[in-house]
A protein has these predicted regions:
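Transmembrane-helix bundle segments that line or gate the permeation/cavity pathway
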Residues: 50-207, 226-250
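Hydrophobic alpha-helical transmembrane segments in integral membrane proteins
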Residues: 428-452
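Internal/C-terminal transmembrane anchor helices
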Residues: 274-277, 281, 413-436
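Short aromatic-rich membrane-water interface segments that cap or initiate transmembrane helices
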Residues: 213-228, 305-325, 383-393
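N-terminal signal-anchor module of multipass membrane proteins
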Residues: 1-79
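Extracytosolic and intramembrane catalytic regions of membrane-associated proteins
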Residues: 458-516
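Terminal, non-globular segments
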Residues: 111-113, 117-122, 221-258, 264, ...
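Membrane-embedded alpha-helical segments of integral membrane proteins
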Residues: 358-407
Length: 516
C-alpha cells in the first residue's frame, strides 16, 4: 500500500495528514542543501528588507532585495521539482513591472503599494507553484487563494526555519545553539541598552563606552531591531515555503467549502432582489431628469448660466464617485444573495441579469458625468496629483463595470479574477509612467501656451524640476529646491535613488552649465 502511494507521488508527510489527521506525528522533514541555503538567505534578506523600510526612502534597495527573494526561492523551488508555471508564472511576472514603480515613481504611496503587491505576489507564486490553488487556471477563487497564501500557510510551518538552518549532525546542534544564543542576546538587548542609558550620566563611563564601541548606540539598536524583525520575517517566508511544498493546511478554506458557503448565501428570491433595487433605479431616473441641463453640460464643455468653473466642476464630483462605488457594492450584494436558477448552470435569474446591466449602465453614465466635470476643472486650473488619482480611480471603476456587463452575457467570464488583473494593470500603468512628471509637463505646456496663469507644482517633488527649468520657473535659492543641487544629494545613498531624482539631477547639471 505504501509503495503504491509513493509511486503515485504522495509523500509520507501528506498521507499522515490526510488519513490520520493529528493522531500520528508528522515525519521530520529532511531539508536539502538548496533548501538550507534558501533558509539562511531568507534570514539575510529579511534583515535587508527591514533595513530598506520604509521603501519610499530606499526604493532601489527594496527592488533589489525583492528580486533577490524571488530569485532565491524560484531557484530552490525548481531544484525541488516545483517549476513555476501557469498562474504562478503570470503573477510572478506581474510583480516585475509593478515593483519597478518603486524606482520610476517618486510618490511614497505608490512606492509602498508596489512593494506590498510584490510581497503578496511572492506569497502567491510560492503557493501556486506547488499546486495548492483551489482551482486550476484563472479562477474567481483567487482572493481565497491569496488569503490562504498570506495568512494560513506561513503559520502552518512557522518554526521550520529552525530545523532547516540546523543541518544534520554537528551542524544541526550548532545551528540550534546559535539560534538559542541569538534568542538570549535578543532578550538581553533591552535591559542592556537601558542600563547603558542610565549609566551614561557619568562622563568617564561615556568615554569608555565610546572607546569600546565605535558604533553609535542608536544605530546599533536599529541594526539589532532589524535583525530580530528580519528573523521573524524569515520564519514567515520559510514557513510559507515549507507548507506549500508539503501541501499543509489543505483542509482550511477548501474550494468545496467556499462553494458551500456561497450556496447558502443565495437565499433571496429574484423577485425580492429586483424589488429592492427598483427604488434605487427610480432615484437615478429622477436625478438624471432633474440635473439634465446642469450635469450633461459637462459633455458639451460649456457652463450653465450664472455658475463659476470652480463651483460647477467641483460640485457633486465626489458624491458621484461615492454613488458609483455604492453601485458596485449593490451589484456585489445582489449577485451574492440572489437564489440561482434550477437549471444547474448556477446562473442568476434573467431578471437579475437585466438589473445588473441597468445598474452598471447607470453607473457608467454617472462616471462619465463625473469625469467630464473633472476635465472642465482641469481645463480651468491645471493638473494636480489628487485630480489625476481621482480620475484614475474612475477609469478603473469604468473598466470593472464594463466587465460586469459582459459577465451577464458571457457566464464563463471570471469576473473577480479579471477585475483584480485590471486593477493590477492600471496600477502598473500609474506607477511606471511617472505621473508627477507628466503633471508638471502638462502644467508647464499650458503655462507656456498662455492658457494657465500659474502652474501648480505642489507635491510633485523631483519630478517637477526638469519642467520648471524648461518653463523658466526654476529658482535654486528657494529652500524647497535646495535638495536638488547640494552636495548632500550628490553623495546620497545609491539605494535611495529614483528615476525622477536622476532626471532632476541631470536637468539641474545642464541648467548650471548654461548659467556659466
Amino acid at each position: 500500500m505504501d509503495s503504491e502511494k509513493i509511486k503515485a507521488g504522495i509523500r509520507p508527510a501528506e498521507w499522515y495528514e490526510k488519513e490520520n489527521q493529528a493522531m500520528i506525528p508528522r515525519p521530520e522533514r529532511i531539508f536539502t542543501v538548496p533548501e538550507r541555503i534558501c533558509a539562511w538567505g531568507m534570514i539575510a534578506l529579511g534583515y535587508g528588507l527591514f533595513r530598506a523600510c520604509p521603501v519610499y526612502e530606499y526604493p532601489l534597495g527594496g527592488i533589489l532585495l525583492l528580486w533577490a527573494l524571488f530569485g532565491l526561492t524560484l531557484f530552490t523551488l525548481r531544484k525541488g521539482g516545483h517549476p513555476v508555471r501557469g498562474m504562478a508564472l503570470a503573477v510572478c511576472l506581474s510583480a516585475l513591472p509593478v515593483s519597478l514603480a518603486m524606482f520610476c515613481s517618486g510618490n511614497a504611496m505608490i512606492q509602498t503599494a508596489a512593494f506590498l503587491y510584490g510581497m503578496a505576489a511572492y506569497a502567491y507564486t510560492v503557493y501556486a507553484a506547488c499546486g495548492n490553488t483551489l482551482e486550476e487556471g484563472l479562477s474567481d477563487l483567487l482572493p481565497m487563494d491569496l488569503l490562504r497564501a498570506v495568512f494560513v500557510l506561513p503559520f502552518g510551518s512557522f518554526g521550520s526555519l529552525v530545523q532547516a538552518v540546523g543541518g544534520g549532525g554537528i551542524w544541526k546542534k550548532s545551528g540550534k545553539i546559535l539560534l538559542r544564543v541569538f534568542g538570549g542576546l535578543s532578550l538581553a538587548m533591552l535591559p542592556t541598552l537601558l542600563a547603558v542609558s542610565l549609566l551614561s550620566y557619568d562622563s568617564k563611563f561615556r568615554s569608555s563606552m565610546n572607546d569600546l564601541v565605535s558604533l553609535d548606540l542608536g544605530d546599533l539598536f536599529g541594526h539589532l531591531l532589524d535583525l530580530g524583525l528580519g528573523l521573524l520575517l524569515a520564519l514567515y517566508l520559510f514557513g510559507l515555503y515549507t507548507s506549500a511544498t508539503e501541501k499543509r493546511c489543505a483542509a482550511l478554506l477548501t474550494a468545496a467549502g467556499c462553494r458551500d458557503v456561497a450556496g447558502r448565501m443565495h437565499s433571496f428570491s429574484p423577485v425580492t432582489i429586483c424589488s429592492s433595487a427598483c427604488p434605487v433605479l427610480f432615484i437615478y431616473g429622477v436625478f438624471f431628469f432633474s440635473q439634465w441641463e446642469n450635469y450633461v453640460s459637462a459633455f458639451r464643455g460649456t457652463l450653465p448660466e450664472n455658475i463659476l468653473y470652480s463651483e460647477y466642476a467641483r460640485e457633486g464630483f465626489f458624491e458621484l464617485c461615492a454613488v458609483s462605488f455604492l453601485n458596485l457594492v449593490l451589484l456585489t450584494a445582489t449577485g451574492m444573495f440572489t437564489r440561482r436558477s434550477d437549471t444547474g448552470t448556477n446562473r442568476a435569474h434573467p431578471a437579475v441579469r437585466v438589473l445588473h446591466v441597468l445598474l452598471a449602465m447607470c453607473t457608467l453614465v454617472l462616471i462619465a458625468t463625473a469625469v467630464s466635470k473633472m476635465f472642465l476643472y482641469i481645463e480651468a486650473y491645471g493638473l494636480t496629483p489628487k485630480r489625476v488619482y481621482a480620475t484614475w480611480f474612475m477609469v478603473v471603476l469604468t473598466l470593472v463595470f464594463v466587465l460586469v456587463i459582459v459577465k451577464q452575457f458571457v457566464p464563463r467570464l471570471r469576473l473577480i479574477a479579471l477585475s483584480m488583473a485590471v486593477c493590477v494593470g492600471m496600477f502598473a500603468l500609474l506607477g511606471l509612467t511617472d505621473v508627477e512628471g507628466r503633471i508638471a509637463a502638462y502644467n508647464v505646456d499650458r503655462y507656456l501656451a498662455g492658457t494657465l496663469e500659474e502652474p501648480d507644482f505642489a507635491g510633485l517633488g523631483a519630478s517637477a524640476v526638469p519642467e520648471k527649468i524648461r518653463g523658466g520657473l526654476y529658482h535654486p535659492v528657494h529652500p524647497a529646491l535646495t535638495e536638488f543641487h547640494t552636495e548632500d544629494w550628490e553623495n546620497s545613498n545609491p539605494f535611495t535613488l529614483t528615476l525622477p531624482e536622476l532626471r532632476a539631477k541631470a536637468a539641474v547639471a545642464e541648467w548650471g552649465d548654461m548659467q556659466r
